[in-house]
Structure formats: C-alpha cells, structure tokens
C-alpha cells in the first residue's frame, strides 16, 4: 500500500506515490532517531529527495532529521495535528519526494495510538523482518 491509498476522503489523492518506511523499535532508547537520520542522510547524499516525519509531539528529533534530509520535518501526532492534516502532509511529501521516512515513538506497540496504529492508518510499511 502506498501513502496515497490511505488518504481520507477529504484529500484528493491525485497522482502521488512514493516509497515509505516506518522506523520502529521494541522500546525507547533503541536507536530509532539514529537509524532514521542515517537513512535520511544516506539517501540525500545519493541524490534522493527525502521527507522525514516524527511520531508524537517531539521537537528535538525533527531538528536532527531536518539537518540529515535537508528538508522540513513534520510531526505525526493525531491529537496535535489531526488525521486530515497528517494525511495532507504525507500526500504532499509523496508528490515531491523519492522516499518518506517516519520515525516511531517508544515501542512499536506502546501508547494509544501506537506506532503500529499510525503505520497501519496511513499505509506506511513496517519491515517485520527487522522487528525484534
């Protein structure tokens, strides 16, 4: 499923499709920010346009990701931003980017909504082979 497939009806899906990956871990402090920033930097250096999103109301990690990707970073927080706003931002990113990275918060199944809930809601794949 692509990001465009998960858009609510209020968003015109248009022709937006882009590979996306949700970066998750079993708990906090496991290196999600480091891995996300490293992936963003690697793909940016390879000439790809990378857009990074951060789950939760975090304002420090997005600054790291903005430096790594060279692009603004937005939060994915349903309480703060709302589903329609997040969907619009993901859709806009899919139109202009070559890769979307979304960094989870805490463990994959921690919190309500959890990172797994967010990934499912917006159609962002989580590589289960990498999940420990």
PLM regions and their residue ranges:
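ATP-dependent carboxylate-amine ligase catalytic core
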Residues: 5-125, 130-132
């Amino acid at each position: 499923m692509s990001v465009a497939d998960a858009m609510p009806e209020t968003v015109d899906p248009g022709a937006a499709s882009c590979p996306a990956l949700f970066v998750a871990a079993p708990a906090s402090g496991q290196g999600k920010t480091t891995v996300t920033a490293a992936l963003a930097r690697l793909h940016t250096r390879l000439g790809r346009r990378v857009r990074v999103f951060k789950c939760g109301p975090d304002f420090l990690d997005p600054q790291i990701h903005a430096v790594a990707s060279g692009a603004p970073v937005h939060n994915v927080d349903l309480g703060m931003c709302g589903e329609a706003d997040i969907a619009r931002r993901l859709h806009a990113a899919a139109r202009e980017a070559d890769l979307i990275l979304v960094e989870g918060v805490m463990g994959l199944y921690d919190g309500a909504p959890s990172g797994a809930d967010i990934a499912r809601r917006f159609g962002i794949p989580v590589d289960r082979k990498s999940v420990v």
